[in-house]
């Protein structure tokens, strides 16, 4: 799986069209979501369903079971970070984002969420730093150049 991820990320760095970027990101997400274990799939799927239904407490419970069963599964941490964020628990979300990125430093979903939270919390410089890190992974991500320019203008102005 790691070689496949490396290949997809190498292609993502040079992808220029939105359709190509989306297809590569979808391929990466598929690999990130693969647990290879029925019980872990059950936790993951139940958590995703709870997220979609707006039941963030239940989602956090399911993702916590997943994390306890396999702490090395980065997507469990990322999904729980999302649930914490949606529940307004930004500190807990940021801690899970940090663990996601420790396990998978290229996690563009976690980077994007981190940048959003930092900006929302008033840390424009931190958000800019994270967005620049994201730009190294996917320089042509739709909307990213505008976000970077807006933040740079805001910080200079």
Task: Locate predicted features.
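Alpha-solenoid helical repeat scaffolds
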Residues: 9, 26-29, 64, 98, ...
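TPR-adjacent "capping" and linker segments in tetratricopeptide-repeat scaffold/adaptor proteins
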Residues: 1, 29-42
């Amino acid at each position: 799986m790691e070689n496949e991820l490396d290949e997809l990320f190498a292609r993502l760095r040079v992808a220029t069209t939105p359709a190509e970027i989306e297809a590569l990101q979808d391929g990466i997400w598929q690999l990130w979501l693969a647990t290879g274990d029925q019980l872990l799939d059950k936790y993951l799927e139940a958590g995703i369903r709870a997220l979609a239904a707006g039941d963030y407490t239940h989602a956090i419970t399911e993702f916590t079971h997943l994390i306890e069963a396999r702490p090395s599964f980065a997507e469990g941490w990322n999904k729980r970070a999302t649930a914490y964020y949606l529940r307004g628990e930004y500190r807990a979300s940021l801690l899970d984002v940090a663990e996601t990125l420790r396990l998978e430093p290229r996690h563009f979903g976690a980077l994007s969420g981190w940048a959003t939270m930092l900006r929302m919390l008033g840390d424009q410089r931190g958000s800019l730093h994270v967005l620049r890190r994201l730009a190294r992974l996917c320089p042509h991500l739709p909307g990213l150049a505008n976000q970077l320019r807006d933040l740079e203008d805001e910080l200079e102005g």
